[in-house]
Design a protein with these regions (language model features):
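Short, conserved SAM-binding/catalytic segment
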Residues: 3-13, 77
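Short acidic/histidine-rich motifs immediately flanking catalytic phosphotransfer sites
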Residues: 11, 30-35, 56-57
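General small-molecule cofactor/ligand-binding pocket signal
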Residues: 14-16, 89
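Conserved Rossmann-fold cofactor-binding substructure of NAD(P)-dependent oxidoreductases
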Residues: 17-35, 39-45
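ADP-ribose/adenylate-binding Rossmann-like module
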Residues: 42, 51-72
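Rossmann-fold NAD(P)-binding glycine/threonine-rich loop
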Residues: 64-88
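Adenosine-phosphate binding glycine-rich loop
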Residues: 84-124
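Active-site-lining helix/loop region of Rossmann-like oxidoreductase modules
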Residues: 108-161
């Protein structure tokens, strides 16, 4: 991360290594910055506490959270963000994120929209001969969590588990 941040000519971008489970170290790091881009997964585990700490340390916040579980809790921090005059934007990855923006763009081109569906086409995906990962990573943990966990659905005008 530091190497990536250092590749920008603008020295206002920094990358740090941090144990985000160490609340004091997290708060100390956030206190030195105006904004945080949280890429720390799995998000069902780390998104809410990092957002909460960022807002309490008066940081603007962006992430690529793609887990529904913390998203509901994170929305509850809206008032804290408003009180601190901070912006918090969650779900800026591929899906949610780019898929939402593409759907919005498509909707603006139509006279009327009843529903929008997004999806992934993985039919052309080819398995790797050898994994590029030497260990379990956040994406793997996220995938398993989403496959075996419960999912909230919207049926008959209400959310259900």
């Amino acid at each position: 991360m530091k190497e990536f941040a250092d590749s920008f000519e603008n020295n206002k971008i920094t990358g740090i290594g941090l144990d985000v489970l160490d609340k004091e170290a997290l708060r100390s790091a956030l206190a030195k910055h105006d904004a945080v881009l949280n890429l720390t997964g799995p998000f069902f585990k780390f998104a809410y506490p990092i957002l909460e700490a960022a807002l309490e340390e008066n940081c603007h916040y962006l992430d690529i959270c793609d887990d529904w579980e913390p998203t509901e809790k994170m929305f509850a921090l809206h008032e804290l963000a408003k009180e601190n005059n901070r912006t918090a934007i969650i779900g800026l990855g591929a899906s949610p994120g780019i898929t939402n923006l593409l759907a919005l763009k498509a909707m603006t081109e139509l006279d009327e929209v009843n529903k929008i569906y997004t999806g992934w086409d993985i039919s052309s995906a080819e398995p790797e001969e050898e994994s590029s990962q030497s260990d379990v990573n956040a994406a793997m943990v996220h995938g398993i969590e989403q496959m075996v966990g419960k999912v909230k659905v919207f049926i008959n005008n209400k959310f259900q588990m």
